[in-house]
Amino acid sequence: TSEELNYIIEHSESKAVLVENKYVFEKIKKHHNDLSLIVFLDNSMHNPDKNIYSFDKFLELGKESLNGKEDFAINKSKKLNNENIATIIYTSGTTGKPKGVVLTHGNILHNVRVLPDIIRLKSGDKLLSILPIWHIYERTISYVTAITGCFTAITNKRDLKIDFTEEKPDIFISVPAIWINIYNTVMKNIDRKGFISKVFAKTLIKGSIRYTRNLRYQNNLIYIIGDETKEEKIKYYQIGIFDYIFHKLAQKIIYKKIIELTGGRLRLTISGGGALPMYIEDFVEAAGINLVVGWGITETAPVVTLRSPYKNYRGTCGTPIPEVTIEIRDKKGKVCKDGVMGVCYIKGPNVFKEYYKDKE
């Protein structure tokens, strides 16, 4: 909101801002005369007399100021260490005014260092990302792809379908809302069909999901809390011959179109930033797309846990990434038993330094 943006400018004592367009520019109208530099990312305004620059002109100024000294950034970086502040990212302010999360180079580099091995990124992989570029989720992923020699394409809801087809990504970085939307679109298209075709398609999907879920139980890839043993679950979830047939038919008739829609090369999709409903996971997995879920927050740069694509336990948000430990404690500070709710304590090199101007 305009109120949040103006608060962030004031609280951070910012002297320069980059704005997407005139709409955002108007939201910070009260600070137009206070700022030393305003850069328009869409190049829609350029007025140096008022300290306003288009992005392209701003880049030209940067090249001129370097004056052939391309090693300027490298020399600067040599003076940095893991404890130096890399960025301050403000939270959404859902529990009050936005808080400035102070992240160090060490915080971010920890995620950058450990994530490629978990998801087994290969040089030359192409990633498609629909994340907001100001979120730490997107920023960390961009750093990860840069150091592994991968290519990242940035998309949005409007262009997602076209970019899937044109970019043909190996990995899709997403949020739950995208997969919910894809699922709803498929179901709406099925509902528009005639009665027999509609019932047939839904029967195939239902049988296919049942087959995929039962296969998970047989392969011991569902986390179980409660009195039932894994042996009891495996015995109960036997794979039926008809479900197998339904699954194969669904692959040819329904899922094939989804695979084509996502470019035909999708090896993995990572979902974060919110809870993903189990029925969506069921559907995406049945369609033949390997989906992993992670959990994290801005204060941890951001990944804390992530499911492995090769040991993808459903019903969880994964195990702690390397060098990170988690404990769930009760109000007295004692570690809770499995399945008992409590407060999550996180320790690791990715945990932020402090809240800006709010160390308490």
Task: Give the predicted meaning of each segment.
Residues T1-L61:
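Structural core segment of the AMP-binding/adenylate-forming
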Residues T1-S2, Y7-A16, D125-K126, Y143-A153, ...:
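A short helix-loop-beta submotif of the ANL/AMP-binding
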Residues V17, I85, T91-T94, L127, ...:
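Conserved S/T- and glycine-rich ATP-binding loop of Class I adenylate-forming
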Residues K63-Y90, R120-K126:
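Conserved pre-ATP/AMP-binding loop-to-beta segment of ANL
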Residues A86-V112:
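Conserved AMP-binding A3 loop
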Residues L109-K126, I133-K230, Y237-Y255:
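Conserved AMP-binding/adenylation subdomain of ANL enzymes
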Residues I130-H135, G273-A275:
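Conserved AMP-binding
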Residues T212, D243-E360:
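Conserved AMP-binding/adenylate-forming
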